[in-house]
Amino acid sequence: DRANDVLFIAVDQLNRGGNAIKVEHKRMELAKLNLQAGEKAMSLATFVNAASYLKKGISLLYEDHWEKYYDLSLKLYSLYAEAEYCNGRFHDISQVAAGVFKHAKIYQDKLRAYAILIKALGAQYKLQNAMNMGFEVL
């Protein structure tokens, strides 16, 4: 629909100059727009596009983002791991999930990342690792 097209076009254009943005709140606004575009792309099952938006959103975050922008960071990282799982690109999932595990404030915030990581291990036929992680989560 037209609203989706406008969102994707606007975010694509803003991303072209995103790394040049030096003002923190403007940069975080663009990261939020990438999250919105990523969420919308996930809902439309365009997982490659979703991963691209989410990865760009992550790249816009500052070094102390987990402290200052916890909710945004958690959403970007968790959804990026999910998008990469849907794309069958498993190499980044464990690294992204490790970031969530390290910085999550509460156990519930880790669950989505654990679920994606367990599914990714299973999809790679690393069933023993998937089961071990499942038991660890329990």
Task: Name these PLM-found stretches.
Residues D1-A120, Q124, N129-V137:
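Extended alpha-helical scaffolding segments used for macromolecular assembly and cargo binding
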